[in-house]
């Protein structure tokens, strides 16, 4: 897999619009498996190179100001080599910006590995996992990571799960040297990658296991909640039994006019049966309660 992070020129107080992609891409950070570490940086007018703070194994390539198209094309060639691309908020920014900027610069669609959908970005021949959407999923936040983070920014999540943070030079981004820009961008790509690799690839293993159980593509698992996982599994079981799956409107029509008489005074429906608990310590306890309050308390 390969993590991707980009940096873009911007006017003070205005965030670049990925749909318009009017500003130059100034850096592309790439961190992949098998010790793949590379960063592309666009030279900008009046910006010094500065000092290289990166490790020797990280390859830094500088492009002249008029070579942005070549820089993006080179990044696309690398992206095509990996079956999994990992980003942080890549659905909303990084990949749409690269896609639209490439189109704006005249890179043909045949040479663009990205594919835009209505509310997400993916690859023509691969899987894109947006960790922002994955880690803001309460199923992962609460059950997998014990709510160790409450804010979903890359900095907050990385600090909680990895004990690492984004780089802060204390300068406006347009005041950074080229090597500082490279270090900043690569560090974001590295944090994104390590969120999938820490604790023996815990998150990637979880995604694969849930995809197998829920019979869903792994990129859908990474973006959808537990109710969709269960629905997909039920669809699979229905099809395996050659059973028809009713449409939602058919279910609604079926229940029209159905009324339930109260069985308990002043209540419309009978509540669940409450069993008096036996005091003491209990082992081999199993809880089956989806997205509810009580399993969280028990945990």
Regions found by a protein language model. Name each.
Residues 7-9, 35, 134, 280, ...:
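Short, glycine-/Ser/Thr-/acidic-enriched flexible segments
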Residues 4-6, 90, 131, 288-290:
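Residues immediately flanking
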Residues 1-84, 99, 249, 261, ...:
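Conserved RNase H-like, two-metal-ion catalytic cores of nucleic-acid enzymes
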Residues 94-104, 291-299:
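Short active-site loop/helix that positions an aromatic residue
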Residues 37-42, 46-66, 85, 95, ...:
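Active-site-proximal helix-loop-helix substrate-binding element of RNase H-like nuclease domains
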Residues 83-91:
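Acidic beta-strand-to-loop metal/phosphate-binding motif
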Residues 3, 86, 128, 274, ...:
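Structured core elements
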Residues 172-299:
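Common nucleic-acid-contacting/processivity interface regions adjacent to the catalytic cores
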